[in-house]
């Protein structure tokens, strides 16, 4: 029975997905076998190779093989089946090459199902070398020397350490891109919500420099005043030092002048502690130990203010 190329290629695709490299195709017969290629022989081409299987004489092929390979077309080669043992795997491959075969299919002499890639010297080796289990070898032997049985050698999909590293790297890169996208979208939503606040989000516009400079200042003397609530700047989290210039906001909260100037000049025109807008005329009682950190006034930006908007102020003491 003649098989069309479409049927054969379909079978090859199925076998590839099953990771079967040795496929026997004949009349009403399709068998696939797992194998492992030797490390010192040429690898099977991506398109696969087709041939006829013969049993080596002698079977161990530790001496010259007497049944020489028959010359066939370039589309069909001759393969030889050899049993493991008696000599090295490399020697068997070289004997098969000397006899004119294009591939040496060696099967285990024991019933060990573990297939280990065989090593050897690749110098002068031009044919394929494959190792299969003993059970596979016994089945292949029953179909050898039959012209109607085609043996296909198909490359498998091996997973190397580099492949694993590549997949891991791509996965991490994709996750990072997703997280970055979520962060950007969330930040855009917050900014859009701020713009939609009443009065256009008053309190988030930059304070004019002349208004900023008009706010009173004082030189810290080290004496804690009765109305003062802290000896630490709430922006830079540093204690006040004697002689430092402090700026006083209308809400009576004090900060390092350089800190609050940077804060109010970066489109954050509200007190870092009580969130009151220094430009409004709201009468707010002096701060005390019970003063809430977030003011309930309409100009409050509540939770929309993010921690990453705080300025970083570096003071250098000379």
Swiss-Prot record:
Residue ranges constituting the PA domain according to the UniProt record: 70-143
SUPFAM superfamilies in the record: PA domain, RING/U-box
UniProt subcellular location: Prevacuolar compartment membrane; Protein storage vacuole membrane
GO terms of biological process kind: protein transport
Signal sequence, renumbered to the chain: 1-20
Pfam families: PA, zf-RING_2
Domain of life: Eukaryota
Sequence ranges on the Lumenal membrane side: 22-163
CDD domains, per database record: PA_C_RZF_like, RING-H2_RNF11
Function: Involved in the trafficking of vacuolar proteins. May function as a sorting receptor for protein trafficking to the protein storage vacuole (PSV).
Name of this chain's protein: Receptor homology region, transmembrane domain- and RING domain-containing protein 5
Source organism of the structure: Arabidopsis thaliana
